[in-house]
């Protein structure tokens, strides 16, 4: 059996209380960015969801360092994928006895970091 040299680590955050469209704005922003630069950008981002993305990214970095022994300074975010999760359906009373439906969207976030060679 041939064993591959694994040089990437992943982390995931599931059932985040934000729509996938809003989460994808932040995920697309950090995609293909160096981890150190992405952490600075997420720290000072005005988006509410940036804190959750930062926590997930720090988890991926910790997985890379502790489980695989990768060098933190050479890590790059290769994948930042967003997926839809459940939708909570709620009812809001309106005028004249009517009611409308409110959808509360949840999302999943998957981050993969890879160690890149210095050129």
Curated annotation (Swiss-Prot):
One GO molecular-function entry: rRNA binding
One of the GO biological process terms: translation
InterPro entries cross-referenced by the UniProt entry: Ribosomal_uL22, Ribosomal_uL22_bac/chlpt-type, Ribosomal_uL22_bac/org-type, Ribosomal_uL22_CS, Ribosomal_uL22_sf
Domain of life: Bacteria
Gene3D superfamilies: Ribosomal protein L22/L17
Any Gene Ontology CC annotation: cytosolic large ribosomal subunit
Keywords in alphabetical order: Ribonucleoprotein, Ribosomal protein, RNA-binding, rRNA-binding
Family: Belongs to the universal ribosomal protein uL22 family.
Reported function: This protein binds specifically to 23S rRNA; its binding is stimulated by other ribosomal proteins, e.g. L4, L17, and L20. It is important during the early stages of 50S assembly. It makes multiple contacts with different domains of the 23S rRNA in the assembled 50S subunit and ribosome.
Subunit: Part of the 50S ribosomal subunit.
Record's protein name: Large ribosomal subunit protein uL22
